[in-house]
Amino acid sequence: CSRAQPMTDALCVDGIQRAVRSLEKAFRDGNDLDAREDMALCALYSGMALANAGLGAVHGFAAPIGGMFDAPHGAVCAALLAPVWAANAKRVSNREKFDRVDDLLGGDAVSWLRGMTERLDIPKLSAWGICEGDLEEIARKAAAASSMKANPVSLGHDELIAILREAL
């Protein structure tokens, strides 16, 4: 996010490390208390980070989608994570933080996110009734969403449509 600073970066790095080791474990085995503790801390850290640094394009999309469709917020965000990360990574001028996340996620954040989305059976946006004909309205509303202001790059209309298409 464009308003990130050292405190939010530290929270996010620790949260990412915990999610890497525990997200799938907690998903598969709710009795794994160590994994659940890690994920509880991830949730806490992410709340602290978003309160201080803002959100970005994932939530910029999720707000209008949630208002237009009966779609769970978390599932929508998860479906959008990899396409948004890929779009941002192509355009960001300072790669330092993106490279750090790549390292934390085994060298390629987009591949890790796509793989985790598949392993956790996260539905595509089309599962919630979203179709090609809805993309223009979603993109228009997303572009105006307050969450988009903290995205690390300004995404144009065509980029917003491409992200949505990839997540369909």
Over which residues does each language-model region extend?
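Short acidic alpha-helix initiation/capping motifs at coil-to-helix transition points
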Residues: 13-17, 56, 92-93, 112-120, ...
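Short, amphipathic C-terminal "tail helix"
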Residues: 132-168
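Hydrophobic packing residues in well-ordered alpha-helices of helical domains and bundles
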Residues: 12, 36-39, 98, 135, ...
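Glycine-rich phosphate/pyrophosphate-binding beta-alpha loops
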Residues: 44-77, 145-150
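Short alpha-helical scaffolding segments that buttress acidic/His motifs in well-ordered protein cores
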Residues: 39-47, 81, 113, 117, ...
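Catalytic-loop motifs flanking and including active-site residues across diverse enzymes
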Residues: 11, 15, 57, 76-80
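Gly/Pro-rich interdomain helix-loop hinge
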Residues: 67-134
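Carboxylate- and glycine-rich phosphate/diphosphate-binding segment that chelates Mg2+/Mn2+
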Residues: 1-53, 152
